[in-house]
């Protein structure tokens, strides 16, 4: 009887694990904008009030915006703010077509001023799409190499750059 019960428990866990594995979707099945949102959420995480002037998923509070120091945004508010910012940056770089989402992600993290002066944008302007080295070079924080930023750039490039 114990063997039969053990067999059914093992069978049930196998069926449950298989169903859960089938429910997972590949990030590559999502539209590029949704992929970018997921990548930013993974690497930024939801900021706490102690990270002021950054709120949500890394949004830098600008003068005149309604966000107050010491107030935590909900996940829903942070997601809406992230999408709004990312759409704004996508529109800013829309003339670069399929590369606009990659430039928007870089601008979300570094700021549009950095992107506008970058070798990535200069290469894309002249039609050179060999930007891997230039894109992954944006991995420094306070002048020092930052492994997590490098990992982020690799992920963004692998998931968002299309040939």
Give the residues covered by each predicted segment.
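Residue-level detector of conserved, well-ordered beta-strand and adjacent loop positions
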Residues: 56
